Each structure stands twice: as structure tokens, then as C-alpha cells.
Amino acid sequence: MARKYFGTDGVRGRANATLTADLALRVGMAAGLAFRRGEHRHRVVIGKDTRLSGYMIENALVAGFTSVGMDVLLLGPMPTPAVGMLTRSMRADLGVMISASHNPFDDNGIKLFGPDGFKLSDQIEHEIEELIDEDLSKKLAQPMDIGRARRVEGVHARYIEYAKRTLPRDQSFEGLRVVVDCANGAAYRVAPDALWELGAEVISMGVEPDGLNINRDVGSTSPAALSAKVREVRADVGIALDGDADRVIIVDEKGHVVDGDQIMAVVAHSFKEDGRLSRDGIVATVMSNLGLERYLKDEGLTLARTSVGDRYVLERMRSDGYNVGGEQSGHIILSDYSTTGDGLLAALQVLAVVARSERPVSEVCHRFDPLPQVLKNVRYSSGKPLEHENVQSAIADAERRLANHGRLLIRPSGTEPVIRVMGEGDDFELVEGVVDEVIEALRKVAA
């Protein structure tokens, strides 16, 4: 079904352009009506990251929810996974996170969570979309039933304690010098405090949000600053979160980046050794490196692949009973503990492995050599180039040449008229050659 407001991760857009206070007001009213079930007093928790527009959207949502009779609990700046956890913990009917994740400050978004802490299904989002466009004036609460709003104290400590409880009680990071980059985002308070409480020597960066600097040259999408800082202070490890802290990238003591694939390899091995894997495998997307798949196979584990997007990873985990999954970009989902990707929780699991091994991060977190990848795009104006006979022939020939030595992934973008062609394999020149052949065939058809 076509979507008007919701994308793959909630309602998102440029602040005060596509995502206005009026739209946020209507989202609050519509979502409140959709979850106002039964006779009990209904409540919604709202968290946000540190974007300037978060104040505007937060207040508009409060007006929307209270106008239809829902009480609002305001958390302030908190990681996305913390909002999911607190939605469950506070027995709320609904949770909301105001964030555009790793995007620049001028974007923002509204993510919704059900009472179980999971993001909403497509069906419920469709119901909310229909309500957004309705005349809701006749569904407003009576004056005596208008909701109340209040700020909740102590939520940072609750999330930190929750994060610490994912580790053994005697686990300590004493002796580890850790640089943590919070992207001037939602975790700027909780991440350094959690690491300090676990005994680490903590050096913080990206912890001075001003409403405009979220994700600006810091965080998981810009790890160069963290790499430089780790080398400068001779730290054992660096941790980079994104703006809403649902993804993480790690940097070893040499300043080398450890991506989500390597993090999943570390966690999968650790969980297997401890008997914590719910199945003999993990879930990742089609973009994860073939090197990860081969590593897991050598460990006696499988890799189940999904479409790109952490929501698809989580859907597969829930339907098939996996408890570890993620994306190369650093979304790591540990479903024994969290209902969404949680950068801090994933980092704690990796640090626990490092602390127990007493080996440098460069050894612990380099589980496999990634295969060379080549990614190229072709823009087209109309039609369906992938269905053309010449393109199909080029794809078949490319797959035949790669055979068991690599793989080819071709997918249209979900947001623009672009076809992405990704190849990977043992031989870089072969991979680049087959990708170029498919690209050339697509360009001729697209022209």
C-alpha cells in the first residue's frame, strides 16, 4: 500500500518544510486516537535527540496527544532504544522518539513504538495515516478529559542501570581507556556515565550539543575524528554512536574502523561460546560482506539475509527466532535485551569480550578479512531498465563469471530513480569488471 507520511523509519522530513508543527500536531492526535483503547487513563512517553527543531515538534506532539485525552511523559534527550525500553517499563500505551537518526540537524522525524516497545507494523501506520487526513475536530476530548503532561526525572539512571544489567554482575572495564563519541546527540549523557560506572577510564567527545551540531563531523558516520582522538590519547578503544544512538561503530587502538559486520562477528562468537545464541546463526542484510558469511560458516553458524533496513532485520529475527542481527552500518539488534538497534548495548558486549580476552581490540575485533566490494549507481528517467533483455543477459553473464567466488546484488533505490549495482568477491579486478558490464548495459537502456 502507498504511504503518504510514513517511510521505512517513521515520519521524516526537513524541519519546518515537510515536517511542520502542524503535521506533528496531527500525528499526535491520530496516533493518540489509534492507541486510545479501553477505559484506563492512557499515556504516551516522548523522547528526543538534540536537534533544535525537537522543541517545536515535541510541543506540537504534546498538544496533539493531550487534545485527544492522552497523558504525556516527557523524557528529554534519550537514545531511541531507551524510549522503546521505557515505553514498556512505564506501562505506556505508546512511545515516541523525535529524531532523524544520523541525518543533519535540519532534518527530523517521528518514530512510534507500541506498548511492547517495538516499532509499529505497516498496518497500524496505515491506520494512523488515514486518521491524519481526517477531520479530527469531532474526536477531541471533553475539557475534563484533556490529557496532562509532565517531565519525568531519573530516566537516565534507569536506562544506564538497564544497560549494565545486560552484562554479568562482576563484569568490569577497569583498565580500559575508552574514547566515546556521542555525535552531539541523544546519548551525550548516558553513554559516558554508563562506561564510567562500569570502571572504564572515559574520554568523551561529541557531548556538547547546541541544537545545530548533531552528527556534524562526529559520530558513527564520521569516524575520522574518533580515530584521531584514539591515537592522540593512546586509548584502547573508541566507540562512535549516531545522533539517536541506535547504531555504533568501533575504532581499535590503531585508529582502524570496526564496522557492523565485524561487531556482529564478535557478538555471534561470544554468544555461541556462552550458549546464548537462540539459533545457530544471525540475521543481516544483503549488504553485509561475504567475508562475514564465510566466517560464520567456519564457526558452524549461518547468515540469514534480508532487505536493507533494520526493520527488516528485526522482522526476520522475530519471525524465525534469532536473537542477534544487524547491519554493516552499525545497527546491532540484541533482542534478548532490546526491541531495536542499541549502540550502547552492542558496544558493552564487545568491550566485555575485550576485557575478558586481555588482548588488543585490533585482534579481538578483526574476525575476517572483508572481500573487496564495488558499488556503482545508474540513474534512469522512466521505465523498468532491469526488465530489459540486454540487461538480464548482462546480469546472467556476470553471475556466471562470479560463480562461487563472489556475488552480485542489484536493487532499485527506494527513494530516487537510481539502480544500485554491488559486486563483491575474492578477485577485485573480476568484481569491478562484471559490475562495469552490468552498469554499461543499464546505461544504454536508461539512455
Swiss-Prot record:
Protein name: Phosphoglucosamine mutase
Catalyzed reactions per annotation: alpha-D-glucosamine 1-phosphate = D-glucosamine 6-phosphate
GO cellular component: cytosol
Pfam families the UniProt entry points to: PGM_PMM_I (PF02878), PGM_PMM_II (PF02879), PGM_PMM_III (PF02880), PGM_PMM_IV (PF00408)
CDD domains, alphabetized: GlmM
Binding site for Mg(2+): S101, D242, D244, D246
Organism name: Azorhizobium caulinodans (strain ATCC 43989 / DSM 5975 / JCM 20966 / LMG 6465 / NBRC 14845 / NCIMB 13405 / ORS 571)
Free-text comment on the cofactor: Binds 1 Mg(2+) ion per subunit.
Catalytic residue positions: S101
The gene coding this protein: glmM
Post-translational modification: Activated by phosphorylation.
Swiss-Prot/TrEMBL cofactor(s): Mg(2+)
Keyword tags: Isomerase, Magnesium, Metal-binding, Phosphoprotein
InterPro entries according to UniProt: A-D-PHexomutase_a/b/a-I, A-D-PHexomutase_a/b/a-I/II/III, A-D-PHexomutase_a/b/a-II, A-D-PHexomutase_a/b/a-III, A-D-PHexomutase_C, A-D-PHexomutase_C_sf, A-D-PHexomutase_CS, Alpha-D-phosphohexomutase_SF
Keyword Metal-binding: yes
GO BP annotation list: carbohydrate metabolic process; peptidoglycan biosynthetic process; UDP-N-acetylglucosamine biosynthetic process
Record function comment: Catalyzes the conversion of glucosamine-6-phosphate to glucosamine-1-phosphate.
EC number: 5.4.2.10
GO molecular function: magnesium ion binding; phosphoglucosamine mutase activity; phosphomannomutase activity
